[in-house]
Swiss-Prot record:
UniProt name for this protein: Small ribosomal subunit protein uS15
NCBIfam families reported for this sequence: S15_bact
Cysteine disulfide links: none
Organism lineage: Bacteria, Bacillati, Actinomycetota, Actinomycetes, Mycobacteriales
SUPFAM superfamilies documented for this protein: S15/NS1 RNA-binding domain
Source species: Corynebacterium urealyticum (strain ATCC 43042 / DSM 7109)
Length: 89
């Protein structure tokens, strides 16, 4: 259920600050969002997969923390990111 190398590379290319950027909040949030979307689709078919549901909730919490950090340090980058990802806030 992990992202493939190609999916990860495409996400990092779109949201990273440079080609090999994996540490910026934008890149991390984009990767987490991709995994969250993938898990959400999985759970639509497998409603009783509670182990995956718990993993999903952990990922959502991690993304929330990164978004909170980004909002407190640079509000413009935060607003740009949530608009590009289509997140509600």
């Amino acid at each position: 259920m992990a992202l493939s190398k190609d999916e990860k590379a495409a996400t990092l290319k779109e949201f990273g600050l440079h080609e090999t950027d994996t540490g910026s909040p934008e890149a991390q949030v984009a990767l987490l969002s991709a995994r969250i979307n993938q898990l959400t689709e999985h759970l639509k078919d497998h409603k009783h997969d509670h182990h995956s549901r718990r993993g999903l909730l952990l990922l959502v919490g991690r993304r929330k923390g990164l978004l909170k950090y980004l909002a407190s340090t640079d509000i413009e980058r935060y607003r740009s990111l949530i608009e590009r990802l289509g997140l509600r806030r």
